[in-house]
Structures are given as structure tokens and as C-alpha cells.
Amino acid sequence: MPSALINVPAKAKRGDIIEIKTLMSHIMETGYRHTASGDVVPRDIITSFTCRFNGAEIFRADLYPAIAANPFLTFFTTVTESGKFEFEWIGDKGFSETASASITVE
């Protein structure tokens, strides 16, 4: 069962640049491997990641088969107000996972 680990600072000062780290537990099967009997192992990857802050999109990434299992993404953003980060992963076979984290700006 997929699960997300999120690292967002609990507090920051107005205008600070903060680092956000995400790790999603997922097999990321490329669809290029074959079984011992020669059948193709079906592709099963996360295809997109989106981060929103207080409803506004601040980061988006499209993911492809070359991404390793359990994709780790890190990015930076500037915070000017307290609020809530919302993270969304979408993938093959109807995969969808969400997580959230809040930050207080002083």
C-alpha cells in the first residue's frame, strides 16, 4: 500500500526560502521488464506530482519510467503567510494519493 513521507518545516519567517521533501512508497514498474516466461510486466508508475499552497499550485512534476522506485522529490519555495501545503500523486491503474502539511509563518 503506497504511503507518503513529507518533510515541511513547522515554522518559518516571512520571506524565508524553505525546502520541501517528499517520498512516496511506490514500485514504479517501468513496463520494460519481462517475466521468466517472457511476458511483459505491465507498467505501473506515478505519472505526475503536484504541490499546492493555500490552493495555488507552486510545483508540478511529470514523472516517467526512468524514475526509480519510491520517488523522492525535493524543491524550494518562499513563504509569505501561514497555510497548508497539499500534495498529490497521480499514476497508472487509477493510482491517486494525497497528503498535506501546514506551516506557520512568523
Which residues make up each language-model segment?
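Extracellular Ig-like/FN3 beta-sandwich strand-entry sites
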Residues: 17, 80-84
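Short beta-strand edge segments in extracellular beta-sheet folds
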Residues: 102-106
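Contiguous segments within soluble domain cores/interaction surfaces
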Residues: 5-10, 14-63, 68
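Proline/serine/threonine-rich low-complexity linkers at boundaries of modular beta-sandwich domains
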Residues: 1-2
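Short strand-edge motifs at loop-to-beta-strand transitions and within beta-strands
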Residues: 71-75
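Short, aromatic- and glycine-rich surface loops/edge beta-strands on solvent-exposed regions
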Residues: 83-91
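Short acidic/polar inter-strand loop motif in beta-rich domains
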Residues: 91-99
